[in-house]
C-alpha cells in the first residue's frame, strides 16, 4: 500500500488468491492468480514485435543502450471502474490494484500498445521496444547522446521511470 499500487476494498464481485513465485535472484514475488478473471476477458490481439526482427534492426549501429522500465506494468493506472475486478485476498484483508498488475491476460498487449504510441516517432529509426525493454541505437557515436535525450524527453513526458540497475548505456 505504501507504493500506492493497491487500495483496500470491501465486497468485491471478483476475488483472487495470492501466490508466491521465486525469482531468479532468490527473492520472492507476490503474484495474484487472475485465472478466473482472465477466462472471461476478451483477448487483446495487439501484436508484439518479433525478437528476430528487433535483433536484425541493430545491424550497422555503433552504439546501443539497453533500458528497462521500473515495474513497467505498475506504471499504468487502472480505470477506476476496473480496479475492483483485480481484488485479491490476504491475511490482512481485501485489496485491489490501482495500477495494472502482472498476471492480467492483456497486460502485455496493453503495455506494448502504450510504448508503441509513446515512442512511435523513434521506433525503427533509433529505437526498438519490446514491452518494458527498450533499445536505443545509433549509427554514429556522436549522435547517441542526442538520441538518448530524445528518449528521455519522451520518458519524462509520459512520467515513465526506468530501473537503473537493469540499464546498460553505450554498448559498442
Where do the model's predicted regions map?
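Retroelement reverse transcriptase polymerase core
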Residues: 1-172
